[in-house]
Every structure is written in structure tokens, then in C-alpha cells.
């Protein structure tokens, strides 16, 4: 050990003692790494490379599926928008048809009510007219009877009554 201190104090020197410098140990380790490391690391690297390639392939497959799904979703969206537009147009047309039908029924109902009111008015006018005719006839008969009773004698009255009964019987 003193020798190494002496060399260190005297300058740069090489220690050629193989066992002290661990050159053999380093050579064994280097040879072991050279011999076994490529198989071990190579296998690990190959497995890692395969895993990465498989992950990339899976990612590409998922991307392709996602792209296809997106394309299909866009087609479905387009189809749904067309259907929604058609439904909207159909609903507007149906609403317009219902509105026109409702207006038509309202006009018809108003005409029917107006006609019914006119018919009721005509019936009432006919009833009142008939009643007025009966009243006028009754008054005329009463007036005629009152004037005739003073002008007719019993024989003429008897003849007039028989003729009136005959006229009533003909009706």
C-alpha cells in the first residue's frame, strides 16, 4: 500500500498488478455482458418492440373503426336531419290542412245556423200569419153575424145556416 502512495506522490504511474486493479473482474463482467446481454436484452427489446407494434396496430385499427363509426354517424345525422325536415314539412302541411278544414267547417256551421235561424223565423212568421188570419176571420164572422142578425129574419137565417153548414161539410 505504501508503494501506491509513493507512486501517487511521484506522478502518474500505471499499476500493473492485475488482481489489485480488478481488470480480471471487469473482463469477466464485460465478457458476460457481451455473451448474455444480447440474448436477454434482445429478447426484452424484441418483446417490447412487438408490444409497441401491436399497440400501434391496435391504435390504427381503433382509428379505422372510429373513422368508420364517425362516417356512419355523419350519414345517420344527415339522414336524421332529412327525416326531421320532412316531418317538419309534413306537420306544417297537416296543420295548414287542419286549419283550412276547421275554417270550412266553421263557415258551414255558421251557414247552417243562419239557415236554421231563417227557417225558424219563417216558421214563426207563418204561425203568426195564420193566427192573424184566424183572428181576422173570427172578427169578420162576428161582425157579419152581428150585422146579419139585425137584417135577417128567421127564415133567411135558417137558410144561411144551412148553406154555411153545407160549405163547412165540403171542406
UniProtKB/Swiss-Prot annotation:
Membrane topology listed for this record: Single-pass membrane protein
GO CC annotations, alphabetized: plasma membrane-derived thylakoid membrane; proton-transporting ATP synthase complex
GO terms of molecular function: proton-transporting ATP synthase activity, rotational mechanism
InterPro entries noted in UniProt: ATP_synth_b/b'su_bac/chlpt (IPR002146)
Segments traversing the membrane: 12-34
Subcellular location: Cellular thylakoid membrane
Keywords, alphabetical: ATP synthesis, CF(0), Hydrogen ion transport, Ion transport, Membrane, Thylakoid, Transmembrane, Transmembrane helix, Transport
Coiled-coil portions: none
Function of the molecule: F(1)F(0) ATP synthase produces ATP from ADP in the presence of a proton or sodium gradient. F-type ATPases consist of two structural domains, F(1) containing the extramembraneous catalytic core and F(0) containing the membrane proton channel, linked together by a central stalk and a peripheral stalk. During catalysis, ATP synthesis in the catalytic domain of F(1) is coupled via a rotary mechanism of the central stalk subunits to proton translocation.
Subunit structure: F-type ATPases have 2 components, F(1) - the catalytic core - and F(0) - the membrane proton channel. F(1) has five subunits: alpha(3), beta(3), gamma(1), delta(1), epsilon(1). F(0) has four main subunits: a(1), b(1), b'(1) and c(10-14). The alpha and beta chains form an alternating ring which encloses part of the gamma chain. F(1) is attached to F(0) by a central stalk formed by the gamma and epsilon chains, while a peripheral stalk is formed by the delta, b and b' chains.
Family: Belongs to the ATPase B chain family.
NCBIfam families linked: PRK07352.1 (NF005606)
Protein name: ATP synthase subunit b
Organism from which the protein derives: Prochlorococcus marinus (strain SARG / CCMP1375 / SS120)
UniProt lineage: Bacteria, Bacillati, Cyanobacteriota, Cyanophyceae, Synechococcales
Gene for this chain: atpF
